[in-house]
Amino acid sequence: QPTKVVLNDTVWNIHPSHIAIDSGRVFIDNFLFEHEDQYLRIDGKLTKKESDSCRVDLRNIKLDYVLDIVQFDDVEFGGLVTGKVHLKSVMKNPVMRTRLNVHKFCLNRSLLGEADIAGVWDKELGGVRLDAQIAEKGISSTHVTGYVSPKLKGLDLSIRADSTNLGFLQPFIEGIFSEINGRVNGNVRLYGDFKHLDLEGEVRAKMDAKIDVLNTYFQIRDDSIHISSGSLDFRNVKVYDREGHDGLVNGYLHHTKLKNLMYHFNIRGNNLLMYNTYEAGNMPFYGKVYGTGNVVLDGGNNAMTVDASLTTGNNTSFTYIT
């Protein structure tokens, strides 16, 4: 009989179908789960025989529905999945091949583009080996290879980025940087269990971001960032403020599996806009400070120290409220 199911405040229809279970075999005749232009259709046989197969058709299924099943929630994926999954010999030696398209594929709410994903089941891993091409037409391309394993509760992905949107980093560095905008080129490995992910690689970035405690925006026009397990290292990275004044940044951002951030940055500026705040109730001072010299930021565990040795430049204003 037709059945209605509510999933995330959306009413889905389960159409009449026939499912039979007999001696460890499952026979599915046209199971259809749909809502408007979204559907999941399953048809075929789940048995030990290599000659028996099952096909799963998807159209506009939200990617986060799928990943909720494996409790992969430290990284947020988005997009609409359309494609086919072919299964054989599921009850003995599973064989799976899939070809999926993800429309408006997002990572941490940052658009990466249209994703074309090919996958095969790996029995040893208990997961899927995948090869994905992700592209924003005329803007960027990202190539991802590796595996995702529910059995191991982890993943290991090699990512080759060509002008890839790096806004996906924002959740990992909340409270230090905000309003991240830019593109990245290079190679990165994302690996670890779903709850304890890590990164390594080397990239060149073109980006701008705000350092929250200083309320200043800095731009990297094209420079390298070194990524190793637990650390992002900045070595003589040239930065610019929004008025074109320049400086150099040295330092690091340390993390424990993308959590518990600790950082140390030395910003050496040449008439660089180092501080730009307005009168507010939580601080006894405010102002706009152009400086030549050094500002050192140290922080972590919800604490921060700022140490400055500067010669102030023209157009500097600073007010201490008594």
Language-model region placement:
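Interface amphipathic segments
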Residues: 1-187, 194-322
